[in-house]
Amino acid sequence: MLFADFSYQYFDWWHDIIPDANEFDMNGERFEHSGLFKNKIINLGATVGINDYWNVTISQFFLERCMEWDGPVDEFGNSLTVHHRTECSSIDFFNDEGTQMAYGGTSGDARINFRYLLFNQGKGPGNRLFFGIGLDIPSSNVITESPWKKTDGEYTPHRHFYISDGAYKLNLDLQFFNKRTKFPVFWGGAFTTSLPLNDSKYGFSPSNRYQLNILALSGSNSLQKIKLGEYALSSIGLTLFVDYATRSSWDNEGDTPNSKSLLYMPGINFLISAPSGNGLGINIARGYQYYFNENASDIDEDTDIYSVTINYRTVLDKIIEKLY
């Protein structure tokens, strides 16, 4: 099976004045920070069945993250804060001394996952249970220094966002799905954990992440009349995505402010099928994020999040003879 996912994420964000921005005069930053943050993410991959119980998926992320600064600027349009400016992650970033603070690019992490079929009812109603284990391989497009580091009591120009956090990660997942003859005809979910195996070469220790994906889909009988050419609407469903992140940290800088968080995104999902067996999915979601303000360095923050994801799947009628 070959697949391609495209996701567009829109963040309308705000956070309070950064305390002690400058120990002497706060760099003149007696203002709140706000702006827009937009992610465009493509995930390309392939899944191959090794035997009747195991398959392997290899995928590669490509993405761009762009910030639109909505705070004060000077007469030339330059941001009045060293923390934010209008820029994209595809471009390198250097500070005033010419030190490279971020490596720009669009290539994200690569991923290899093995999944084992623990239980499968077959084509009819019943349960399906899968266990997965995998590895994330980091990209070199990272930031090179903590955004919260001070030099002579002041923050220097830096970038907060990045393509990769520079660490290898162990991925574990457990998936359960149930097919029924009444609504919802298909429901289930996946619990996934992502555990960093090392710090980045620049001393960043990423968060552990624990994610839950839940879905419930309708049947197709009443929807097949909705067609566009050879494509037909096969299912409408509800989704819920939950993501809990623990504290991240930098060497000699301590915990990263506002890094411990809980994100939940309810959404609606549309599945579109074709006679060839190919499938197209569209998910529209609204996100809500809660920050655990437990440390003195944490600040008040609020974000409105919207997401649209389009995924495409095609099953190849091919057999790799050496695997069977």
Label every model-predicted segment.
Residues 8-41, 160:
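Surface-exposed strand-loop-strand hairpins of Gram-negative outer-membrane beta-barrel proteins
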Residues 10, 46-54, 118-123, 178-185, ...:
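Outer-membrane beta-barrel strand-turn architecture
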Residues 64-207:
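Outer-membrane pore/translocation modules
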Residues 6-12, 60-66, 109, 118, ...:
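Transmembrane beta-strands of outer-membrane beta-barrel pores
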Residues 33-66, 180-216, 228, 244-247:
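Glycine- and aromatic-enriched membrane insertion/assembly motifs of diderm outer-membrane
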Residues 2, 40-44, 108-112, 129, ...:
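Hydrophobic, lipid-facing positions within transmembrane beta-strands of outer-membrane proteins
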Residues 17, 22-24, 194-324:
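Outer membrane beta-barrel transmembrane domains
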Residues 1-3, 55-57, 113, 128-132, ...:
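Residue-level detector of the transmembrane beta-barrel scaffold of outer-membrane proteins
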